[in-house]
């Protein structure tokens, strides 16, 4: 299992290289945007985009995993279709070929004969990427490969990726929008139980060199299986344990701290915003991208990511859910939380990843229908939910 996670870290870095390469030239980037077909549109946005970068990343992840772990590819699922129609009306199925030259030739068809762009992309796609992590390298965990399913969101926050804002200032470490909100999400789950087991979140655009204007990224991972919990922030947390501001909000003093912080979507319902302002005061942050908002919880920048609508999907939440599980947290169904009586001692309604929504079509089959709350500390979540319910209008807790 740690071999699979190691490989996922490598392919996520290769994916990040592709995402960065596609942003290097504005002229090239204009070629890479194709509006999504009606059945594939995410209804939250009036206009949604499918990019060649999206599809390339998804195919690179699929085919690299297939090469290293034959059979696993049939359980890799994602948002993107790998079919393109070029300006000449040709329908092309995009795949990773065995050589750089063949991939460049196929990409050239998608890009209407643009050889320079095609060759540049093929070079990045076929580049070997090494990734080492001392914590992971010292671990060996075995799990049957045939119980694993993988959700991939090749480029989450596509709108921010296309817009490409590079000079957005953060608010207490949280970016409201811009390239920093773009993430590559890979979540591994148990296909029998739907429980998330491993997660990788790669943030391709973290800091930009002022001289070269090239971007550097950051990668986060977590593993939670059969009582073993590990994550990439362990070293950061242990270094900070001596101070009052350590990451992680664990321990009794954190559980009873009266102040909460939350990250939300700018499109969040006014009723939720009003209740949150009574619970969190001015510690509410708006940010783009479900993956990025979840990452803010992973990083300990906020206690909670809350979203009341049904426009996030399994590929948006699985990676962060696995990392948060490894940290003692999770992602739960908001609607079920609001309807639950905490006095009955029922388990928190964790999201699961193996079951379609009954009666739904298209991408809605995999929507997180009840909304979600991502958290790092169960005690903090219980206290937060109690306060949220008290501050919501009575009707809102049952909608």
UniProtKB/Swiss-Prot annotation:
Q: Which UniProt keywords apply?
A: Hydrolase, Lithium, Magnesium, Metal-binding, Phosphoprotein
Identify the residues that bind Mg(2+) 2. Answer: 153, 316
Question: Per its UniProt record, what InterPro entries does this chain match?
Answer: CysQ/Inositol_MonoPase, Inositol_monoP_metal-BS, Inositol_monophosphatase-like, Inositol_monophosphatase_CS, INPP1_dom_1
Q: One GO MF term, please?
A: inositol-1,3,4-trisphosphate 1-phosphatase activity
- SUPFAM superfamilies per UniProt: Carbohydrate phosphatase
Entry binding sites for Li(+): 54, 80
GO terms of biological process kind:
phosphate-containing compound metabolic process; phosphatidylinositol phosphate biosynthetic process; signal transduction
Q: Where does 1D-myo-inositol 1,4-bisphosphate bind?
A: 156-158, 267, 269, 289-290, 293, 311
Record-linked Pfam families: Inositol_P
Keyword match Metal-binding? yes
Residues reported in the UniProt entry to bind Mg(2+) 1: 79, 153, 155
Q: Which residues form a coiled coil?
A: none
Q: Name one GO cellular component term.
A: cytosol
Tissues expressing the protein = Ubiquitously expressed, with highest levels in pancreas and kidney.
Described purpose of this protein according to its UniProt entry: Mg(2+)-dependent phosphatase that catalyzes the hydrolysis of the 1-position phosphate from inositol 1,4-bisphosphate and inositol 1,3,4-trisphosphate and participates in inositol phosphate metabolism.
Q: Which family does it belong to?
A: Belongs to the inositol monophosphatase superfamily.
- Can you state the subunit structure given in the record? Monomer.
> Known PANTHER family for this protein?
3'(2'),5'-BISPHOSPHATE NUCLEOTIDASE 1, INOSITOL POLYPHOSPHATE 1-PHOSPHATASE
- Please give the name of this protein: Inositol polyphosphate 1-phosphatase
Give the source species: Homo sapiens
The organism that produces this protein has a lineage beginning with: Eukaryota, Metazoa, Chordata, Craniata, Vertebrata
Per the record, the gene is: INPP1
């Amino acid at each position: 299992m740690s071999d699979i996670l190691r490989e996922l870290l490598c392919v996520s870095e290769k994916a990040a290289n592709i995402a960065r390469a596609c942003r290097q030239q504005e002229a090239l980037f204009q070629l890479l945007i194709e509006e999504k077909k009606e059945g594939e549109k995410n209804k939250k946005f009036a206009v949604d985009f499918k990019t060649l970068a999206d599809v390339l990343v998804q195919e690179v992840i699929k085919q690299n995993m297939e090469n290293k772990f034959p059979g696993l590819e049939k359980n890799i699922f994602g948002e993107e279709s790998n079919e393109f129609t070029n300006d000449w009306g040709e329908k092309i199925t995009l795949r990773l070929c065995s050589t750089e030259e063949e991939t460049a030739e196929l990409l050239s068809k998608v890009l209407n004969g643009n050889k320079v762009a095609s060759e540049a992309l093929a070079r990045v796609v076929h580049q070997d990427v090494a990734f080492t992590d001392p914590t992971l390298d010292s671990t060996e965990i075995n799990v049957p490969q045939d119980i694993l399913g993988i959700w991939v969101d090749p480029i989450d926050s596509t709108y921010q990726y296309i817009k490409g804002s590079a000079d957005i200032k953060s608010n207490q470490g949280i970016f409201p929008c811009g390239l920093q909100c773009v993430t590559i999400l890979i979540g591994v789950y148990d296909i029998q139980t739907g429980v998330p087991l491993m997660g990788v979140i790669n943030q391709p655009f973290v800091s930009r060199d002022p001289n070269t204007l090239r971007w550097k990224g950051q990668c986060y991972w977590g593993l939670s299986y059969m009582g073993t919990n590990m994550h990439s922030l362990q070293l950061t947390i242990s270094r900070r344990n001596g101070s009052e501001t350590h990451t992680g909000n664990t321990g009794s003093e954190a559980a009873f701290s009266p102040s909460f912080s939350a990250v939300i979507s700018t499109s969040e319902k006014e009723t939720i915003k009003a209740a949150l302002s009574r619970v969190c005061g001015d510690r509410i942050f708006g940010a783009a991208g479900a993956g990025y908002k979840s990452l803010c919880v992973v990083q300990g920048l906020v206690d909670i990511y809350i979203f009341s609508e049904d426009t996030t999907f399994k590929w948006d939440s699985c990676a962060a859910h696995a990392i948060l599980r490894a940290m003692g947290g999770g992602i739960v169904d908001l609607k079920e939380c609001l309807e639950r009586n905490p006095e009955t001692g029922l388990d928190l309604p964790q999201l699961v990843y193996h079951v379609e929504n009954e009666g739904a079509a298209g991408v809605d089959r995999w929507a997180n229908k009840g909304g979600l709350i991502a958290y790092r500390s169960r005690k903090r979540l219980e206290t937060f939910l109690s306060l949220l319910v008290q501050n919501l209008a009575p009707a809102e807790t049952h909608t």
